[in-house]
């Protein structure tokens, strides 16, 4: 089924990760909502974590006009690089543009240069927030944001689309 179409309030759109417009499962894994994981509602992840993520994606629909770029804040659980591959990666795209790849946890480890500056603060906050600047087609009012995990084990908690009015908040 199709889910909500979000509209901006105070210059940004805040979407719980489970409130997708559409979900596409992977061939061997299904999107699963994990209640109470996250600061505000839940998390959503492909399960089982051992399966390929192949064609899986989450799509969010939002309305925005008179902006040509947005900042997309993707909030994930502070998952460690359990595959030991130099970080786990997801892709972000708007309106079918070429996806931007985000390695969200490459420095989230106990190496001496990261332990105090990255690892401890991130584990304490339990989330990793990455910001991706994406251009949008100004001729359209309705936009589709797609997130594709390249790696398994990524738990998405919240997505914020900043149209220019977002201010960082603890609960996001």
What are these regions (language model features)?
Residues 1-172:
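Extracytoplasmic
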